[in-house]
Regions:
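Long, basic/Gly/Ser/Thr-rich N-terminal segments
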Residues: 1-89
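Loop/turn-to-beta-strand initiation segments
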Residues: 154-158, 409-412, 448-452, 486-491
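The conserved Walker
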Residues: 129, 468, 497
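P-loop NTPase motor domains
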Residues: 164-171, 199-475
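P-loop NTP-binding catalytic core
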Residues: 61-122, 572
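Glycine-rich phosphate-binding loop of nucleotide-binding enzymes
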Residues: 99-187, 253, 502, 550, ...
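Conserved ATP-driven motor cores of ASCE-family P-loop NTPases powering translocation/secretion/packaging/pilus
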Residues: 471-472, 477-562
Length: 588
């Protein structure tokens, strides 16, 4: 079949072949033997009786090692790999391996992957719409739950998607084993939806979470959020200390305005604006201010006489100053405690008056933007996602997500962000990702509870946005760089890799690339994916639906892999226009 080698370069050998050989050997692996040297190659091109063979690595004592040190001589022999060598390349059939798919080049020979090498590293899955990407993901997870003699009982796979397309594929995983369970949380407002209502405890969100949730545009707003959280923590108990603190803040804010260099009418308007949003039983517009032998309604104290002065300036000033307590050391630390969006909005209002932010032209825009966004959230249908009935810690919350019932756990938790806008969905994915990373860092034994964060339509979330500029980091970049140490792994699934953060993509170690057509996507993947070759890029151009090029730490060499049809499949197929539009018609 193969004749003598005509030429050897750094990475290739050019050899003659018999004239009756056709293109069936294209992409087939061969072994080039030169005494004790056995080099693995792949037939990349056939032209006029010559084949171009790319060097991939070497076999030593039956084991394959990527890369070569020595080149073969021109006298070397070339043959197609044998069964033992093929087994070495497609993975070992042992307890730590699982089925990935089948090799169409080798008569559907099973391709096995090491579970650790696959699931301990970040994964990227690319492919056009209709390339079989979602079906491939479904089959990959189904294979994990269909091992022989062992079960993935302690697996934790958090799926984030804007549709429930994976529900059909995973809702019946207990058919593999009764210990397997699946949960779905949904943001749908439909009464007929499947899945549980999504609920997120507000006190588990940190400053950066609120920065994303309220879509900040300036670093200055982070300081406002920090102060807001301190106040909501201090006010949450609503005890005498909390009331005294509120009175202290209101009184200081009013006094600062009262003694400002402004006309009386403007001072009155600003004080009334303060008390419109921030008030207590003791300090409000309707409270009776006691004088000597009489009382005066608070708002009436600010009536202006014909000299332009307040009629009860001395009386009201003394009353307000009686609530200022500069001797008490008020807590400036945020302690997670139960609170609601209503209480958070109150805390923000106190933050704005205590810092005088609404009276400062430079800070007014950023301050009022936060106020409007929080008020909008608190008065929208999205408020229900943050309505939790009782306090729980982060550990308890993550456990509640995983817990299936009082005695069983779920292995797959599917978060479906439907009927909400993309901005909120992106914020929620970031919030959950931060929670998962914090939870994993809390564990006494590092990496003891591995969790996969699977992002369908990953380009919606993992972007080159302003988080690095405003917060100093991007949560997905942080997980990509340090998450593996703590068992937090990203799975990025997208048809638009050009929109992914390059810093995150460069940290991925495993890849399943289904068919991609757009030149910009192909160029980006070739540029950003570590160790990808032009040959891999060329291979994926001719892939059938449901077939991918698999490479990375999980594979010995890049291989074309045919993913088996998932059973049951996801609901990701296109609508059947013929069935829905076309009817029988007998026009007589």
């Amino acid at each position: 079949m193969f004749k003598e080698i005509k030429n050897i370069t750094k990475n290739y050998a050019i050899a003659e072949i018999n004239g009756d050989i056709n293109s069936d050997i294209l992409n087939i692996n061969v072994v080039i033997e030169d005494n004790d040297l056995r080099i693995l190659g792949e037939v990349e091109d056939i032209d006029n009786g010559l084949v171009k063979i790319a060097f991939l690595g070497e076999f030593h004592e039956g084991k394959f090692y990527s890369g070569i040190i020595r080149r073969p001589s021109l006298k070397s022999n070339i043959r197609i790999i044998n069964t033992d060598e093929l087994k070495e390349l497609v993975g070992e059939n042992d307890d730590k391996s699982m089925l990935l798919g089948l090799s169409p080049l080798y008569n559907n020979y099973p391709v096995k992957i090491n579970i650790d090498k696959m699931f301990s590293n970040h994964l990227a899955i690319f492919g056009n719409t209709g390339s079989g990407k979602t079906w491939g993901v479904s089959r990959l997870i189904q294979n994990l739950f269909n091992l022989n003699g062992k079960i993935a009982f302690n697996s934790n796979i958090f799926i984030f998607n804007n549709t429930d397309e994976y529900h059909n594929a995973f809702s019946s995983i207990n058919k593999y084993n009764s210990n397997f369970n699946y949960k779905m949380y949904s943001t749908s407002r439909s009464d007929n939806k499947e899945g549980l209502d999504l609920k997120i405890p507000l006190w588990l969100l940190d400053v950066d979470d609120y920065a994303n949730l309220l879509d900040i545009t300036d670093y200055f707003q982070i300081n406002i959020i920090e102060k807001m959280l301190c106040y909501v923590s201090a006010f949450a108990k609503n005890d005498q200390d909390a009331i005294k603190y509120k009175n202290h803040l209101i009184a200081k804010a009013i006094i600062s305005v009262l003694y400002s260099n402004q006309v009386s009418a403007k001072i009155r308007d600003q004080i009334f604006n303060i008390l419109k949003d921030c008030y207590t039983d003791e300090l409000n517009l309707d409270v009776q201010v006691p004088g000597v032998g009489y009382t005066r309604e608070f708002r009436k104290c600010f009536d202006i006489d014909n000299t332009g002065e307040f009629v009860e300036r001395i009386l009201v000033t003394a009353y307000i100053q009686s609530f200022i307590d500069n001797n008490t050391k008020w807590s400036e630390e945020y302690t997670p405690t139960y609170f609601t969006l209503d209480q958070l909005e109150v805390a923000l209002n106190f933050t704005l008056i205590s810092e005088g932010l609404l009276l400062n032209e430079k800070s007014y825009g950023e301050a009022i933007a936060l106020k409007v966004k929080l008020h909008t959230l608190n008065n929208s249908s999205n408020k229900k996602f943050f309505e939790v009935n009782q306090f729980m810690t982060l550990d308890q919350y993550i456990s509640s997500l995983i817990l299936f019932d009082s005695s069983r756990r779920a292995q797959i938790i599917n978060f479906v962000f439907d009927e909400i806008d993309d901005r909120l969905a992106k914020s929620l994915v970031k919030i959950f990702s931060r929670m998962v990373l914090r939870f994993s860092k809390m564990q006494a034994v590092r990496g003891s509870i591995p969790i996969h964060i699977m992002l369908e339509e990953a380009h919606r979330y993992v972007q080159n946005d302003r988080d690095s500029e405003l917060l100093g980091y991007n949560i997905f970049e942080r997980i990509a760089k340090e998450g593996r140490k703590f068992g937090v792994i990203l799975d990025l699934i997208t048809q638009r890799p050009t929109e992914l953060s390059s810093n995150v993509l460069s940290q991925c170690s495993n890849f399943l690339i289904f068919k991609l057509n757009h030149p910009a996507d192909l160029e980006y993947v070739e540029k950003m994916v570590p160790n990808i070759s032009k040959d891999v890029i060329e291979k994926q151009k001719a892939l059938q639906a449901g077939t991918c090029v698999a490479f990375g730490l999980m594979m010995k060499i890049p291989m074309v892999v045919k993913m088996q049809i998932p059973n049951p499949p996801p609901t990701s197929s296109n609508a059947s226009i013929y069935d829905k539009w076309i009817i029988e018609w007998n026009n007589k």
